[in-house]
Amino acid sequence: METLYRVPFLVLECPNLKLKKPPWVHMPSAMTVYALVVVSYFLITGGIIYDVIVEPPSVGSMTDEHGHQRPVAFLAYRVNGQYIMEGLASSFLFTMGGLGFIILDRSNAPNIPKLNRFLLLFIGFVCVLLSFFMARVFMRMKLPGYLMG
């Protein structure tokens, strides 16, 4: 395998360059990277790529039995389609659940007082459970009759 790597360098000669990092480029802080990851997670789970390509409406409308138009936030019976508000609401729930797991992880630090640990555990569990059960409610709105035991 080493000979295969050596073959191109028998013909090519590597230049002797001394590259330096520009002085205005700095290592971002951990919280900056974390914020970028959370924002990108929110946008991707919200279906921003789908929204840009398909250009769905922000909310839909449905005609009731009296002939009046009623706004709806969920595109029912379509798993592979969504309104913009539906994607944002689902993305908020997924992000809240992920943040709940991160809060639960942060509650394991050894130097946290007992009251703060209890509050972090409570907030983490509330975020995770609320996002889970609201996602189930959203699935029932999206696919009526689904998950009915």
Curated annotation (Swiss-Prot):
Signal peptide: none annotated. It comes from the Eukaryota. Keywords: Endoplasmic reticulum, Membrane, Transmembrane, Transmembrane helix. One of its GO terms (molecular function) is protein-macromolecule adaptor activity. It is found in: Endoplasmic reticulum; Membrane. The keyword Ubl conjugation does not apply. Pathway: Protein modification; protein glycosylation. It holds the Pfam family OST3_OST6. Subunit of STT3A-containing oligosaccharyl transferase (OST-A) complex that catalyzes the initial transfer of a defined glycan (Glc(3)Man(9)GlcNAc(2) in eukaryotes) from the lipid carrier dolichol-pyrophosphate to an asparagine residue within an Asn-X-Ser/Thr consensus motif in nascent polypeptide chains, the first step in protein N-glycosylation. N-glycosylation occurs cotranslationally and the complex associates with the Sec61 complex at the channel-forming translocon complex that mediates protein translocation across the endoplasmic reticulum (ER). Belongs to the OSTC family. This is Oligosaccharyltransferase complex subunit OSTC. It comes from Mus musculus. The gene is Ostc.
